[in-house]
Amino acid sequence: MSSRHFKIKNSLFWWVAGLALASDRLTKAWIVATYALTVPPQTTPIIPGVFHITYVTNTGAAFSLFANGSIWLRWLSLIVSLGLITWAILGPRLDRWQQVGYGCLLGGALGNGIDRFLTGEVVDFLDFRWIQFPVFNVADIAINIGIVCLLWSAWHPR
């Protein structure tokens, strides 16, 4: 008797996307439950002057780019997400770096996209003060990791 195993194509893509999305949603839920959205923002120094948890919202894209662009950004994140899902299902089998890269992009796009559709703005809270960088979130990290993985894959083909 032969046993058939159902194997999902690009399974690492789905795992990475799920992990990125879950990490983003859980950390944002914790921030919203723990901190008040105030002006000036409520902040907790983790390493004073270097890294703080600072609850702010952002109507733009990653790192506050395109501020006040939440209407078109919500649709862009939906289109990107649907495109990545379609690519993973109907496209070719991706190499490991591509699966991680596209999975990170999907998880990040969904994480910030959910915020944009629910509230019109994205929750940000990771505040690295020693480099004077905009406050960001886990979805932003996932998107940037995804870009690095895809660049790596392009520069180091199988």
From Swiss-Prot:
Its EC number is 3.4.23.36. The active site is at 124, 140. It catalyses: Release of signal peptides from bacterial membrane prolipoproteins. Hydrolyzes -Xaa-Yaa-Zaa-|-(S,diacylglyceryl)Cys-, in which Xaa is hydrophobic (preferably Leu), and Yaa (Ala or Ser) and Zaa (Gly or Ala) have small, neutral side chains. One of its GO terms (cellular component) is plasma membrane. It holds the Pfam family Peptidase_A8. It is a multi-pass membrane protein. GO terms for biological process: proteolysis. Pathway: Protein modification; lipoprotein biosynthesis (signal peptide cleavage). The keyword Nucleotide-binding does not apply. The chain crosses the membrane at residues 12-32, 46-66, 71-91, 135-155. Signal peptide: none annotated. It is found in: Cell inner membrane. Keywords: Aspartyl protease, Cell inner membrane, Cell membrane, Hydrolase, Membrane, Protease, Transmembrane, Transmembrane helix. Belongs to the peptidase A8 family. HAMAP family: LspA (MF_00161). This protein specifically catalyzes the removal of signal peptides from prolipoproteins. NCBIfam families: lspA. This is Lipoprotein signal peptidase. The lineage of its organism: Bacteria, Bacillati, Cyanobacteriota, Cyanophyceae, Acaryochloridales. The gene is lspA.
